[in-house]
Amino acid sequence: MTSGFDYIVVGGGSAGCVLAARLSENPSVRVCLIEAGRRDTHPLIHMPVGFAKMTTGPHTWDLLTEPQKHANNRQIPYVQGRILGGGSSINAEVFTRGHPSDFDRWAAEGADGWSFRDVQKYFIRSEGNAVFSGTWHGTNGPLGVSNLAEPNPTSRAFVQSCQEMGLPYNPDFNGASQEGAGIYQMTIRNNRRCSTAVGYLRPALGRKNLTVVTRALVLKIVFNGTRATGVQYIANGTLNTAEASQEIVVTAGAIGTPKLMMLSGVGPAAHLRENGIPVVQDLPGVGENLQDHFGVDIVAELKTDESFDKYRKLHWMLWAGLEYTMFRSGPVASNVVEGGAFWYSDPSSGVPDLQFHFLAEAGAEAGVTSVPKGASGITLNSYVLRPKSRGTVRLRSADPRVNPMVDPNFLGDPADLETSAEGVRLSYEMFSQPSLEKHIRKTCFFSGKQPTMQMYRDYAREHGRTSYHPTCTCKMGRDDMSVVDPRLKVHGLEGIRICDSSVMPSLLGSNTNAATIMISERAADFIQGNA
């Protein structure tokens, strides 16, 4: 079946939902959004606490990294959203933008017009903050942002412990200063998750000029010479072609976008030929430059049941469910990842190079160590904000149904190992401060030992994992390894742009969802001629 549109958006994740909603605001254009996953109807998606159950299962791509030779040759689960809203529907809802210097660095790296001064207004446009306003925040945007009403006592103790070891208290990591410790702001509105599927796409679903196709596997982008003209996909067992008279915008994420580009004949020519794919455009940077935050968790068992682990017990679980159903409050209204900090591995660094996430629970996410059954615990995750290691995304096969080879090359640069080890050391020190130590029975792995830097290095190699922030695989710029120009147009091609975290020239010093949304807001202006 063939159908025609002005714009086709390929991928209904954080970026795609924003772009489809913005483009369809113009009633004179026809917009089609194509998503491989399902609609966001599962109730756990919309409960803030539900993220812990969303890191595995049918709403994610079943990805596994290649063996990580610098991380004990482990294959690491690599969670990516496969649902309307993408990562914004399954992430931990932490709202951080990055340091202003990150965007100034983008501009210096060849992304002309992407300095913080250039992009700040797009952050503000997207944000509907229920607490902050003024120069740094927006209050009328589609993306709901708020403070937690009732942080867990252990989260408050974490913030106090950070202050006891010299970190300043910071009520707003997206304000004038990033450094310090505090309680994160969340993409939560009225105690429910506010994904881009909720904040942007849902209000647009009634528009007659917007078509949303879900559970659709995109096979390739169709080209007429060097002009993108359509998209082939399978839905309900039927082969379909959607044609675009204006543009196709690929928003499939930092793993899905390079995969689709290569399947369509755009990428490193030799690799495409190895897989029997005719070359449309030789772009060696497609799938290169993969950057991600390598997170390392330490876990402690508590003396009491103050953390959210107690809600694993049936009577407490029922009580929490009842409280949320009746009042939209209580533990179900928490994202669990409540506390956070930005700090330095090297005090002489100009900006923080480590980020910490405090979880008022142990083993909340799939694959992370828990505490003995019936006990309560806490988790502290740390990661290097601007790693030097670079990885790749490559085709395993020309079959679109086959997942690509994902090699983040974690710890490939020795400097990343040293900074990761320092993050573990600081995490252990945070657990050792009076405000937290009084709650802790023992710290798993390090209990009864006098840890050394070599122990921290070994621990990072054995227990580190993705922080779900892959970026930069179709980077923006002017150099030979860039894939798109500063207006997100693919080099050497017509009628096609890329708009997602893959276009970032380098990884941000924070979570990446807010910046991905900002990129989409800006892309909408580019396409509509407003910038």
UniProtKB/Swiss-Prot annotation:
InterPro entries listed in its UniProt record: FAD/NAD-bd_sf, GMC_OxRdtase, GMC_OxRdtase_N, GMC_OxRtase_C
Catalytic activity as recorded in UniProt: L-sorbopyranose + A = 1-dehydro-L-sorbose + AH2
Keyword check for Membrane: no
Entry EC number(s): 1.1.99.32
Cofactor: FAD
A UniProt-annotated Pfam family: GMC_oxred_N
Record-level Gene Ontology MF annotations: flavin adenine dinucleotide binding; oxidoreductase activity, acting on CH-OH group of donors
Key words of the record: FAD, Flavoprotein, Oxidoreductase
Coiled coil (residue ranges): none
Active-site residue numbers: H469
Keyword Acyltransferase included in the entry's annotation: no
Enzyme category, top tier: oxidoreductase
Family classification: Belongs to the GMC oxidoreductase family.
Protein name per Swiss-Prot or TrEMBL: L-sorbose 1-dehydrogenase
Highest classification ranks of the organism: Bacteria, Pseudomonadati, Pseudomonadota, Alphaproteobacteria, Acetobacterales
